[in-house]
């Protein structure tokens, strides 16, 4: 039922975001559970759409950021890593590139416990089960415990660590812009400009992008205060 719960959480989150491409305010666990099977165990309503859209992020100097009429998001740390898509012994569920990408960003940001030091995360989750998988991969949850965070409601809107309050990739997947949208949504959160899907008190946020056979990873940590 974990995947079903993730799908419900993200689609309900999307109802607060006017830019989300799927709005299903009446979605239920039963509706997800009974939707057509794509490939076991992923069902239709646990998968992302394919849609059109765009995204832009303006990165400036500190001087120009301070002159802006609205508060900036300060970049605390960044990471990029790539690995070969297929090789003997590769762990596609917990890829090394994802681990090292996150570790690099956390080092730069001075984060030692992302699960408690980050307030909200926008993760690249095209299928429901990627939520607990990426939480473990980038250090938001201990190994084999990501599912528990979902089950206990910690990743829902209003939970201890909300994941994808925008509705995420499950609610809008404009190919080519999807990853950058995660970065932009993280920035909106720490700027206090996320509208109805704003997480109260969000001071630090993660934006995470992924591509290929889970082999390309990018992550940034942004904050409301200058690092």
Regions found by a protein language model. Give the residues of each.
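Phosphate/pyrophosphate-binding loops at sites that engage ATP/ADP/AMP, CoA/4′-phosphopantetheine
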Residues: 67, 102-117, 194
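Short glycine/threonine-rich loop-to-helix capping motif typified by GTGT followed
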Residues: 87-91, 124-147, 176, 213-221
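Condensing-enzyme catalytic core mediating Claisen C-C bond formation in acyl metabolism
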Residues: 4-5, 37-104, 152-166, 198-204, ...
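A short beta-alpha structural unit
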Residues: 78-81, 119-128, 168
């Amino acid at each position: 039922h974990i995947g079903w719960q993730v799908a419900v959480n993200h689609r309900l989150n999307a109802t607060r975001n006017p830019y989300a491409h799927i709005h299903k305010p009446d979605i239920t666990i039963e509706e997800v559970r009974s939707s057509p099977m794509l490939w076991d165990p992923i069902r239709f309503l646990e998968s992302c759409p394919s849609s059109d859209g765009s995204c832009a992020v303006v990165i400036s100097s500190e001087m120009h950021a301070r002159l802006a009429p609205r508060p900036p998001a300060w970049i605390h740390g960044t990471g990029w890593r790539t690995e070969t898509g297929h090789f003997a012994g590769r762990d596609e569920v917990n890829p090394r590139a994802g681990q090292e990408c996150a570790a690099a960003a956390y080092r730069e940001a001075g984060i030692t416990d992302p699960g408690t030091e980050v307030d909200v995360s926008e993760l690249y989750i095209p299928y429901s089960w990627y939520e607990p998988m990426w939480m473990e991969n980038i250090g938001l949850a201990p190994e084999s415990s990501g599912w528990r965070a979902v089950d206990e409601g910690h990743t829902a809107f209003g939970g201890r660590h909300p994941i994808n309050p925008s509705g995420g990739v499950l609610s809008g997947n404009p190919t080519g812009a999807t990853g950058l949208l995660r970065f932009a949504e993280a920035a909106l959160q720490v700027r206090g400009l996320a509208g109805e899907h704003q997480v109260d008190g969000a001071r630090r946020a993660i934006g995470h992008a992924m591509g290929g056979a889970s082999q390309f990873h990018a992550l940034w940590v942004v904050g409301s205060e200058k690092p």
